[in-house]
Amino acid sequence: MTDTPETLSGTECNGDRPPENGQQPSSQTRQETTDADETQAYYKVEPSLEDLPAKENQEETGNTKGNILPKGPEDEKILNENPEENLFVVHQAIKDLSLQEISAEDMAFREGHPWKKIPPNSSNLEVSRQKERTAQQQLEQRGDASTTEIEWLGFQKSRPVDILHSKCDEEEEEEEEVWNEEINEEDVDECAEEEDEVRVIEFKRKHREGSPLKEESLAREDSPLGSPGSQPGTPDEQPVFGKKGDIARNSYSRYNTISYRKIRKGNTKQRIDEFESMMHL
């Protein structure tokens, strides 16, 4: 009966009535402790990361565990009497702590700092690495299959470096073609100019060579035809022709000479006489 006044003093301080009908004070104190723990667990507000850093979270966990642990001989007796209820209380407190941590992580994720505040687990890292390796292996296998198909068909993939080289080669070939065309045109022009120069030179040479021959022919033709009544030379001096056709040809050629053209400018009678004299030669 020594424990009853202590329990009564506690209940009187809380404003409750004293126990009636001979109820045991231990049951009341046990119910009060369970109610207090439950109300404390569900009455807590979800904290934010800005207001509650990691140290405060650790202090809260220590305080809750301290509240669960027995403080005096009365609490030790209560724990010894009902161990199942005590285990339930402990599990409930652990659940509350886990819920608080989850809510804090959700707040951090909403604020935009999920990867800084929540470090990844080793198992998650291994899984992610395995996924990356499998993806790389699949890509390599696809690349190898495509290369084998291309080699089987006899083609090769066009790399960017090959494309650049091909473009440069095409540009160089186009420049060479343009250059060759220009050179060919210049060569043709030069050849034409050289041919023209050669023709001019040959024409000049022929003109120079033909001028003394014409002068000699003119001098020979002018000598017997100096006067209209002049007679032809002696038969000894006249050339001997074998046939009449040769005479006609010779006369025709002499008819077309410059001297005869000059003679044609005179009177008709003079021209007739000259022509007859030429035909009788």
From Swiss-Prot:
GO biological process, any: morphogenesis of a branching structure
Domain of life (superkingdom): Eukaryota
Biased composition (Acidic residues): 169-197
UniProt source species: Mus musculus
Residue ranges with Basic and acidic residues bias: 198-223
Residue positions where Phosphoserine is found in the record: 211, 223, 227, 230
Subunit structure comment from the entry: Binds actin.
Gene Ontology molecular function terms on file: actin filament binding
Annotated localization: Cytoplasm, Cytoskeleton
Biased composition (Polar residues): 1-12, 21-31, 135-147
Main subcellular location: cytoplasm
Protein name in the entry: Ermin
